[in-house]
Amino acid sequence: LEELEKNDVIYAARKFNEAELLYPQSVWAPRAALMAAYAYFSQLYYDDTIVELEKFLQKYKNHPRRDYAYYLLALSHYNLIIDETKDLEEILKAKQYFKIIIKNYPNTEFAIDSEFKLELIQEILASKEMYLARYYVDREKWIPAINRFKTVINDYETTIYVEEALHRLVELHYKLGLVDESKKYASLLGYNYQS
């Protein structure tokens, strides 16, 4: 702990790992494994944190602090989200682990923050769909654009992107001569957003 307090994270994590290896049957072994993960997390070494936590979760299946391990794991993936327009891997992993927390540990302090983070992830995923839809519109690929806008409406209905997606669906259907479809989306737009 002394090394951790001095911000010598790598050395502290190694010492925690060493303690786990030297005393595998003690109550300190899983605690040391969690502390190694926390040491990395505290200094933003998220990849190392993920490795430590995955080992912990695999090894200590009945540990009472698995909720904390899942939470740190989810946060580590969440903090690795750099550009949602390119790579969804970290977003989807974060979403997966936040859902595990909400499902398996609903009465913990971590569940509330996990729900909030899931809402933010939904916004990120919806923005990805909108980015792709606009990409198709710019290239006059109407059908793929329509499909992406529909995905926003169907899968991300609580996000801020629904209004724009409906607006674009009205435009695209009208442009394609599908007036009835255009009117359907226009009525949804008017009813829900008074647009």
What are the roles of these predicted feature ranges?
Residues 1-195:
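Acidic, polar-rich low-complexity tracts and alpha-helical solenoid repeat scaffolds
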